[in-house]
UniProtKB/Swiss-Prot annotation:
Organism ancestry: Bacteria, Pseudomonadati, Campylobacterota, Epsilonproteobacteria, Campylobacterales
One annotated GO biological process: tRNA modification
EC number: 2.5.1.75
UniProt similarity note: Belongs to the IPP transferase family.
Cofactor: Mg(2+)
Region (Interaction with substrate tRNA): 9-12
Keyword entries, A-Z: ATP-binding, Magnesium, Nucleotide-binding, Transferase, tRNA processing
Subunit organization: Monomer.
Matching InterPro entries: Dimethylallyltransferase (IPR039657), IPT (IPR018022), P-loop_NTPase (IPR027417)
Species for this entry: Helicobacter pylori (strain Shi470)
GO MF annotation, one: tRNA dimethylallyltransferase activity
Superkingdom assignment: Bacteria
Annotated protein name in UniProt: tRNA dimethylallyltransferase
Gene: miaA
Reactions this protein catalyses: adenosine(37) in tRNA + dimethylallyl diphosphate = N(6)-dimethylallyladenosine(37) in tRNA + diphosphate
Length: 276
């Protein structure tokens, strides 16, 4: 297939995180153009609006008929496809103050419920990411998020995208994850994270990712090497389970199959799309 790849991955977008992200090698990237890799510094934040901007840029400049969007950030993909509202523009200083306000709350979800029951009803109490985003809007606009979105409605994504997902038998997936984790450790995962953790702020977004956060616990002597490996494997299996459930319940017209079936379906779809 004559295609290019857009990486919708919240870890591969960072420079210097190569092992923890299982990023494509430079050789692989030389043969096939990849977008949205090595774009951010460790102390910068990734989010759905950023990925949407990068995706639209890639679609505009790509010289190929097909652009494959690949990755694990299903929540971002859903946000992009459903449409994003314009978010309030705030300075770096304001962002720091807002972050401090939110972090000082004893119960962020309870506070959100008190100022905007409508928004709180749509968010699970354990969904810390969405709770945080809702409170950011409140503190930056002094308006309940539900009211803000009434005057700043979502802008739907203007391109049609076909969706495909791999279905892998549980034991095979677990074995893949175990082998991937072993490979990461053998390739120097701990050394990679040790260097980055010493160089960047401790609250940097990538330091919360699976594979990274467990390595930090090991470096802080809270985990043994054996427990580190077990924790990465267990947390990755749980993440894969959550992603699978999310994909099945949140996307319409999702084609699911084995590696061979999905490959065949994508090839057929790309041929018909090009002809059309």
């Amino acid at each position: 297939m004559d295609a290019e790849i857009f990486s919708l991955d919240s870890l591969s977008i960072y420079k210097d995180i190569n092992i923890a992200s299982a990023k494509p090698s430079l050789k692989e990237r030389k043969n096939i153009k990849h977008y949205a890799l090595d774009y951010l510094s460790i102390d910068e934040k990734n989010n759905a609006p950023l990925f949407k901007t990068l995706l639209e840029d890639a679609m505009r400049v790509s010289s190929k008929e097909v652009l494959l969007i690949v990755g694990g950030s299903s929540f971002y993909l859903k946000s992009i496809l459903e449409g994003l509202s314009d978010t309030p523009k705030i300075s770096g200083e304001e962002a720091v103050k807002i972050e401090q306000e939110i972090n000082s709350l004893a119960n962020p979800y309870a506070f959100l419920k008190s100022i905007d029951p409508t928004s709180a009803f749509k968010i699970h109490p354990n969904d810390t990411y969405r709770i945080h985003k809702a409170l950011e809007i409140f503190y930056s606009t002094h308006t309940p998020p539900s009211e803000y979105f009434k005057t700043n409605p979502k802008k739907p994504f203007e391109h049609a995208i076909s969706l495909f997902a791999l279905s892998i038998e549980k034991s095979a997936l677990a074995n893949n994850i175990k082998q991937r984790t072993k490979n990461m450790l053998d390739c120097g995962l701990i050394e990679e994270i040790k260097a980055l953790y010493a160089q960047y702020p401790k609250d940097s977004q990538p330091f919360k990712a699976i594979g990274v956060k467990e390595s930090i616990l090991f470096l802080e002597k809270q985990l043994t090497l054996k427990k580190l490996e077990e924790a990465i494997i267990s947390n990755t299996i749980q993440l894969a389970k959550r992603q699978n459930t999310f994909n099945k319940t949140q996307f319409n017209n999702l084609y699911t199959g084995s590696v061979g079936e999905v490959r065949h379906a994508i090839l057929n779809h790309s041929k018909s799309a090009i002809k059309g």
